[in-house]
Amino acid sequence: MLKTALVVSLKAVSKIVLICAGGAYLEKSGVLHKEMRKGVSEAFVKLLLPCLLFTRILPTMSVETLPKLAWLAMANLLYVSLGLLIGYLSTLLTKPPRGLRRVLMATPAIGHANSIPFMLVSLIIAEDPAFNPDDTNTAQGYVGLYLVMHSITLWGVGMNVIKKEKEDEPPLAETTETQTPQTLGRPASISAPSQSTGGLNMSEAREDRWSHSISGLELGSPVTNGGPNTKNQRFSCDPRPLQRFVPKWVNRPMATAVLTALVGLIPGLEELLVPASAPLNFLFGAMSTLGSAGPAVSLLAVGANFVADGFPRPSVIGYAPMFALIVGRLLILPGCCISLWVALRHYAPFFPSDPLLMLVMCIECCTPTAYNLVTVCILNGVGARELTAGLFYQNIVAIFALTAWTTVIVSFVI
């Protein structure tokens, strides 16, 4: 059983890595250049992901699904709360500068919740003989429902936790313009090797470009006057005249998930769209085809962005904080949360017995930190370069951590 689970996990994670490697190859070949990567990311957020959410949530949604939606929301709140606690303890141990403490505190709390879980659950179900092929749509529907609460906590908790640091001291982006970049926990005078100012500026500019590239890989960021990529936008999910009335966590994928969940409760509507003989099945089929391509397209952009501007320097964030960022999100949080779900399943009679729900809830706590936390840092002017460097190395370790946790989940949990 363990050997079978390991094979299933290796195949699933390896496919994700190979898709990302394909994106890296296309970038080095000049195909996925900067503008193309931006277009691919926007296509995923504005069209492919909404189509995926609509076509996966609608068949899954029913009155019987509402308790499972509540469990998914509770799971997200648990991951955020426990992640903040882990992040807080890690800052006490590593003692980063005050300007980065809340950034590092948020990194274990907010995980990547769309392209990796969408792709991973479908690959696990396809490889594991214990599941049926039709289970893929149901599991991806659960991932889509999880995104509802994830979007709220990403922008609500993320923006507030990281933004509070601006009250303590000026943003790091302002201080690094006039002094040598500082390694966490070390004075600026010894934080970097002696080199010319021009060399440092080139390195900082490359890492800043890397931060902006990574920040656009996930859910759409809230529209602000100072936010990235808003100057040339003509259309947006958050129209500027109504911006003050729209919460920051409202974006197109989140709105699609909520509206689809509500529409899915309307009796008889599913019969008009989903069955092969339904009169509007051609519309549903086209959206399903577009949505199915979304995770792979998004992962191509991830791979391309990770190699576009070279490797970030580990000294940008510091080795101790980077180690805490990796261990907290990829080892401690999954270990605590998966153990809790297993205990509840054994001792709480009200816990759902759905193995697909358990699979999604466990996978969501094992993913690396959400790329959109970089967007939050950019919007608040603090810690974007440092967080980006940490996420680069965290994602490398996540290849092995995801394989290990997926093996545990398939073998012992579901």
Locations of the language-model features?
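Alpha-helical transmembrane segments of multi-pass small-molecule/ion transporters
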Residues: 1-414
